[in-house]
Amino acid sequence: MAKLAVTGGGRCNITNSFEHVRSLKDVYPRGTNLMKRLLKSFSANDLLAWFENEGIRFTTQEDGCVFPCSQDAMQIVRCLERLMSESGVQLLCGTRVLKITDLGNHRHRLTFADGREEDFDNVILSSGGTSADFLRSMLPHDIGITPTVPSLFTFRTGDDPLKSLMGTVVEHTRLSIPGSGISSEGILLVTDWGLSGPAALKLSSYAARFLNEKQYRAPLCINWAGCTENEVHEEIALLAEVNSKKLVVNAGLSRLSTRLWKHLCQKSGISGEARWADLGKKATNKLCSTLCADNEEIIGRVNFKDEFVTCGGVALNEINSADMECKKHNGLYFTGEVLDIDAVTGGFNLQAAWSTAFAVAAGL
């Protein structure tokens, strides 16, 4: 519930319309095939209809993110708490489970931190991004656990001049990590610590394991223009023709802010006094190269607001995809982020939680 209350900056980005999703692989780097099946049984539309039946109305942003019209995550929390109360669900807060033991015959024993033990017919683990070490100590030892690492974060960069552009937003960029084959595109935000925004968050998700192995230090290539180098050359040629008498720093690409354009000109070695008419081929090529392949350095990561997503968890080959039941231990089920499923930002992680939970409920 605590995690639900902070998602979407406290507004609860409950799901996504999926209207702009070309491939589920783009939004679910891990768990793509499972999500294809689950979304057929319980889609974003099914989720919204379920909550609307409880009196909650929703609004969808241009980017597909869905929020309650109240813009208040607590409305969702209160709704779920009410439904649990009406159904007789007993909620034990501050109660920690240390171990789950399979007793056979569909029975499991929970060992609590205070020493108590209780037996249950069915156990559903929905603990979120729990560490792999804790999962290994809590679950039966024959269940495969994929190591957990952070998968949704922003980047610390080493370029101080870039950080001076704090607050700059570029609507369409392409990011890549040279030598890895990993890339992303989207809106990029320059912050006082480095880079954020959808493009950076997507890249952090796609490259979660790669960056963890590199201890969050890696080269970063930024395509500020968001297009090919040939296309940029054509744009620059037109700019030079139309603005031949103007200073290069004062007549740049309209989609880039004046501050960013001046920064990129300076990085390309173009003087503040240079006019377009005087810009030679070498300087033009350097400018185009900087626009399309600006080299920066990732030197660390920063958690995205109060949201913390991990990749890893219970390996997907350990569960039955129809109802999320553990293949080796009948009566033990897993939902949400405790599984090795994670997504980019935009409501997709919550949808995975809703869809896996529905699969369990339908199977019980």
Q: What kind of feature is each model-predicted range?
A:
Residues 2-90:
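Conserved N-terminal/central alpha/beta ligand/cofactor-binding core
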Residues 20-23, 40, 46-64, 113, ...:
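Residue-level recognition of phosphate/Mg2+-coordinating polar/acidic sites
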Residues 91-95, 147-149, 336:
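Short loop/edge segments at beta-strand edges and connector loops
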Residues 93-108:
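A conserved short coil-to-beta-strand element within the FAD-binding core of flavoproteins
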Residues 97-98, 110, 117-130, 138-139, ...:
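Short hydrophobic core segments
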Residues 122, 126-133, 137, 340-364:
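A conserved FAD-binding loop/helix module that cradles the flavin
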Residues 122-164:
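Glycine-rich loop(s) and the adjacent beta-strand/alpha-helix scaffold that form part
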Residues 160-181:
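Extended, Lys/Arg-enriched charged tracts that mediate electrostatic binding to polyanionic substrates
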